[in-house]
């Protein structure tokens, strides 16, 4: 988890839409405009934190890397999951996440896609995935962390068609993301009942500038020297009435280092690359929205990992190409290719709750 103490000012404004209409707006896009050059909306100092999702097999929290092989449907044995041995003290399961500070989680929420400058099909069909994710059994793997087992807690809210000026260098900064998120949250709602997903179009990079203690961190497939992450989830508290906002950023995922293989996935490379990352960031946003809830706190190589970080797996091909390596799984009756999540209950990665 990283925190930025100060940020330049940004500005934004949302299309005038009544929040009450959003329950009926799931099948349409709400127009949204955000400008970086007018107004003075600010965030509360030290309130902007983020956790990045590293590249396949290259950076990040010790991913499992194996030679490429055929992708198969994943089958999880109930007998295995229900017979996890107890480790006698002082032993422990190194991957188990804890929440010693009782940080908040997302018990229920509306998901809000923000599509920047392109139609939703540019990224596949993220809204369909979010609907299926919220209605699936898989989402209940997270119940153990949020402490609630009720169904239908995560649903699709308003989706936004955002127009935003892209700089000449094709690189957005944190202030640009905050402009977009603030504009959407001003219309759609804020707090722990809303989770915004910002989708950046192909060819647009996103960077956290260098600081005195760390180099620049970027999604920049066109510049391998700074290409450090595929996506991230974050939160920030704005100093106006919008207040606290939870969000993730998914740049274009059908690029080397962030994608599933070109063949063998449930849908196609674009759809499943997008949905795999979206699942990763959504699960971590729910269980650790502000960076102070569920992650590995013990002092092992896994320290700092959130529950999705622990279950990333990549494959390397004979040509040296690296892809995410997961099987095909049904969500709400529709097939997808995406990663499992870590479960403290089974002390391992799983697609189904116990």
Residue ranges and their predicted role:
Residues 2-11:
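Bacterial N-terminal signal peptides that target proteins for export
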Residues 151-235:
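Active-site-proximal segments of metallohydrolase catalytic domains
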């Amino acid at each position: 988890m990283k925190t930025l103490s100060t940020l330049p000012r940004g500005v934004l404004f949302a299309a005038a839409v009544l929040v009450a209409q959003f329950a009926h707006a799931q099948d349409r896009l709400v127009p949204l405009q955000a400008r970086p050059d007018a107004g003075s909306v600010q965030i509360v100092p030290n309130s902007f934190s983020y956790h990045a999702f590293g590249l396949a097999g290259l950076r990040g929290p010790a991913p499992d890397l194996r030679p490429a092989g055929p992708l198969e449907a994943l089958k999880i044995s109930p007998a295995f999951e229900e017979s996890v041995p107890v480790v006698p003290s002082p032993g422990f399961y190194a991957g188990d996440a804890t929440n010693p500070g009782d940080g908040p989680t997302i018990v229920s929420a509306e998901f809000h896609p923000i599509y920047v400058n392109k139609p939703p099909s540019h990224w596949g069909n993220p809204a369909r995935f979010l609907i299926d994710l919220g209605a699936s059994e898989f989402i209940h793997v997270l119940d153990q962390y949020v402490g609630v087992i009720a169904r239908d807690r995560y649903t699709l809210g308003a989706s936004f068609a955002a127009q935003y000026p892209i700089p000449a260098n094709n690189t957005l900064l944190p202030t640009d993301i905050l402009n977009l998120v603030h504009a959407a949250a001003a219309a759609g709602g804020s707090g722990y009942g809303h989770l915004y997903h910002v989708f950046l179009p192909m060819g647009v990079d996103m960077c956290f500038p260098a600081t005195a203690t760390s180099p620049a961190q970027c999604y920049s497939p066109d510049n391998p020297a700074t290409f450090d992450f595929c996506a991230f989830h974050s939160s920030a508290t704005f100093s106006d009435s919008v207040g606290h906002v939870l969000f993730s950023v998914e740049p274009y995922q059908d690029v080397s280092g962030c994608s599933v293989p070109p063949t063998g996935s449930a849908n196609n490379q674009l759809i499943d690359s997008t949905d795999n990352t979206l699942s990763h960031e959504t699960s971590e946003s729910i269980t650790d929205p502000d960076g102070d809830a569920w992650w590995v706190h013990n002092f092992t190589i896994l320290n700092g990992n959130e529950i999705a970080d622990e279950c990333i797996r990549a494959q390397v091909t004979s040509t040296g190409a690296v892809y995410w390596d997961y099987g095909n799984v049904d969500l709400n009756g529709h097939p997808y290719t995406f990663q499992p999540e870590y479960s403290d209950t089974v002390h391992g990665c799983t697609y189904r709750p116990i």
